[in-house]
Amino acid sequence: MSVSHIFGPPEPKYRSVTASAHGKVNLHLGVGPAREDGYHELDTIFQAVSLKEEVTVALREAQGAQDTADPTPCTWSVSGFDSHLVPQDPSNLAWKAVAAIQDLARDAHVAWADAGVHIHIDKGIPVAGGMAGGSADAAAALIAATELYFPDPRSPRRPDSAQLSEIAADLGADVPFCLLGGTARGTGKGENLMPVITQGTYHWAIATDKRGLSTPQVFKQLDQQRAAAPEASPKGARVGSPEALITALRAGNPAEVGKLLVNDLQAPAISLLPNLRETLKAAEEAGAIAAIVSGSGPTIAMLCASADDAVEVATAVSVAGKASSTMTTSSPAAAAGVIKREEVRE
């Protein structure tokens, strides 16, 4: 084994790497009681949609002595959907993802591990909409940073898929699925994933609400609703199972899938934003097979019979004034992956 395989090459191969990761809808989201750690036990079916985030991680020119409190200075730019709402600071999951890979690069003695970086996010997923836009940023950043700092796939120091999944779970419950893509059943906080085989393509109209909803706030509202009606609360893991939904997905039957969409967070989301009920009604009147609050909301995902139907439903909901914006998408979509590499030139 060569020295470069152990310690890494002395110079970077790529100036920048761009990766993409897709958003998601929860076709089934069963929520158990709050655990001692504050999280809730989930039983969910994720499906990746064609809406995606693209994240570019680029090395910056060396800038001499660096502040030891900030050994990897980072600059930012964001474009695309809701770009003005994206935090451009260390609270951003993409930044945390890059920092995690930089730590591995330092441990592996990668020569450019302490170089400054520029992160650019091109957004295609609504912010704070329950479709895992921030988690997709993190997943794409993990893939891009891994390729940037560990360009040799043969390197034993390069993090493998299992290690990336562990890092992803530390970043957020939805990040592992955004790495995986496709369709999967998630348990625990949603990070324990079992891929689900499906047939066909599913078409969606998406309705956003610019007011957004805080995920912790929606879970808190669910807990309060259950405390007020304890007879309706699950005693252990979520009552009910998504097995029938999995069967419908395997058969590729959108009409049957529509009957089986479940989201325990829909009621608390509607109680916080009552106008969501009107959006759901407008979707039904426009001819959607079914409509559901996506994740913790407030985005509404409307399952349609075809791509043309999705356009018609999105248009009808928009014309009715029941959404801040509408768009169409399809599912399932692929795993996170590299889409562009810019090599360093002499």
Regions found by a protein language model. Name each.
Residues R154-L213, P274, A291, A301:
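Alpha/beta catalytic cores of group-transfer enzymes, especially the acyltransferase/condensing modules
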